[in-house]
């Protein structure tokens, strides 16, 4: 954009300076990248003409997007929306930021309306994001709590390598998951939903035939909890070691350009897996029924290894299908961005506040993934 010639000081006052400058050689270039923080006001002046040929008065027309006597332009609106979603700033802080940096006189209402209108314009795009995730082979799901107008609610997340979709609902379970409109629409047997073991994900499917893969990071934390707080059981140590071994082997094979594991590795891991689970369930027996109301507690160790038994295919899916990741990292990273906003803003204003945020955040995260 700009070039500054750094010349010897003694040459600048010389009468032949310009002549020497033209024949000079570049020894080194150093760059400074900066920004110009200034607002630009464009006035649209509506003019009327009296036609000299017909004597008619002709008046110009403002552009379609010029709805009022004063308004902020698309770049300003984009900055406000980005500060709200990616910057995790409250409306009050956005107002102060914009007014300080650009010498605006922006009000709380202007900030809120800008975000709401931006979200309205972006809804068509988020429908396409929703459709793309619903048709993907592998999708990650997660949820995290939030507050709006002093009430509790839940943000539901669906994500792939290229798309991220956020939605807000008062309920955490079945109603909230279905309202997002992604999980329930994955009905192809070749599709995979990567989740934790939260029960609504396992019971919501009905007749849908998609496969379930379970997050290794969650399982590793549960196994570590047994090791640290429940007597360091051998079955937990062995299972943790086996899953780590399987993960490392898969990463090695992927690094070599392989697209699947050989039968020897599959048989080895499967055999050891079954052996560990069987030994654990034999040692930590099903509790006997008592006269007390309700089901007797199985205990943490048996409950976890029953899940290992019942959901073996989902736990080891990363080993059997290299397209399936070993963790729900994609979903958890998407949730992490929300938690930053919730910590800063604490509570969303207005009924549409969380929904507006979800639309804008979905657009920004998806755009970032596409470069």
Spans of model-derived segments:
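Catalytic center-proximal scaffold of phosphoryl-transfer enzymes
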Residues: 48-50, 55-370
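Short, flexible loop/hinge motifs at secondary-structure junctions
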Residues: 1-68, 141
């Amino acid at each position: 954009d700009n070039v500054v010639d750094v010349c010897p000081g003694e040459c600048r006052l010389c009468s032949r300076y310009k002549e020497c400058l033209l024949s000079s050689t570049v020894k080194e270039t150093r760059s400074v990248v900066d920004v110009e923080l200034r607002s630009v006001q464009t006035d649209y002046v509506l003019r009327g003409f009296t036609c000299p040929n017909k004597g008619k008065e002709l008046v110009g027309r403002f552009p379609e997007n010029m709805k009022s006597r004063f308004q902020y332009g698309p770049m300003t609106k984009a900055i406000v929306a980005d500060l709200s979603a990616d910057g995790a700033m409250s409306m009050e802080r956005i107002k102060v930021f914009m007014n300080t940096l650009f010498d605006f006189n922006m009000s709380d209402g202007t900030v809120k309306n800008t975000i709401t209108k931006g979200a309205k314009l972006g809804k068509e795009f988020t429908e396409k994001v929703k459709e793309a995730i619903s048709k993907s082979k592998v999708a990650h799901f997660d949820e995290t709590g939030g507050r709006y107008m002093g009430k509790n609610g839940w943000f539901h997340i669906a994500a792939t390598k290229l798309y991220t979709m956020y939605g807000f609902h008062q309920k955490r379970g079945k109603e909230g998951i279905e309202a997002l409109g992604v999980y329930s629409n994955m009905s192809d047997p070749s599709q995979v939903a990567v989740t934790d073991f939260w029960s609504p994900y396992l019971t919501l499917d009905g007749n849908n035939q998609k496969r379930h893969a379970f997050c290794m990071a969650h399982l590793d934390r549960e196994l570590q909890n047994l090791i640290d707080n429940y007597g360091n059981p051998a079955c937990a140590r062995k299972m943790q070691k086996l899953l780590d071994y399987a993960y490392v082997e898969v990463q090695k094979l992927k690094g070599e350009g392989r697209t699947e594991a050989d039968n020897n590795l599959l048989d080895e891991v499967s055999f050891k897996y079954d052996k560990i689970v069987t030994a654990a369930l034999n040692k930590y027996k099903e509790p006997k029924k008592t006269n007390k109301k309700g089901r007797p507690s199985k205990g943490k160790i048996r409950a976890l290894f029953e899940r290992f038994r019942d959901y073996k295919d989902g736990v080891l899916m990363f080993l059997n299908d290299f397209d399936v990741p070993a963790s729900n990292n994609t979903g958890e990273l998407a949730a992490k961005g929300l938690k930053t906003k919730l910590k800063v803003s604490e509570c969303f204003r207005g009924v549409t506040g969380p929904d507006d945020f979800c639309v804008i955040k979905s657009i920004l995260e998806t755009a970032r993934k596409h470069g």
